[in-house]
């Protein structure tokens, strides 16, 4: 399954490392990533893939909650199909 993840928050060292480490621990593969810093704000969009027989989007979001708290971020994930449907409207 594929999903789109967004990460936003005040820029600081270690954001990409924290997010990618948590995803790797879940065996979630990052297929594509785009990130930018606007003034002091960090923004990143990731296209990720994972085995939906072993893991759900809710499982990933739950794991990312600790990264959000530790890093002071807002992290959201949704299925690629839902993301595409909403953005096609």
From Swiss-Prot:
It comes from Corynebacterium efficiens (strain DSM 44549 / YS-314 / AJ 12310 / JCM 11189 / NBRC 100395). This is UPF0237 protein CE1668. InterPro entries: ACT-like_dom_sf, ACT_dom, UPF0237/GcvR_regulator, UPF0237_ACT. Residues 4-78 form the ACT domain. NCBIfam families: PRK00194.1. Transmembrane segments: none annotated. It holds the Pfam family ACT_6. PANTHER family: UPF0237 PROTEIN MJ1558. Belongs to the UPF0237 family. It comes from the Bacteria. The lineage of its organism: Bacteria, Bacillati, Actinomycetota, Actinomycetes, Mycobacteriales.
């Amino acid at each position: 399954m594929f999903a789109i993840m967004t990460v936003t928050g005040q820029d600081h060292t270690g954001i990409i490392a924290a997010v990618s480490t948590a995803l790797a621990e879940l065996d979630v593969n990052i297929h594509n990533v785009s990130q930018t810093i606007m003034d002091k704000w960090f923004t990143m969009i990731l296209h990720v893939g994972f085995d939906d027989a072993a893991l759900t989007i809710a499982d990933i979001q739950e794991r990312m909650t600790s990264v959000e708290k530790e890093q002071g971020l807002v992290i959201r994930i949704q299925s690629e199909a839902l993301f595409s449907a909403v953005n096609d409207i």
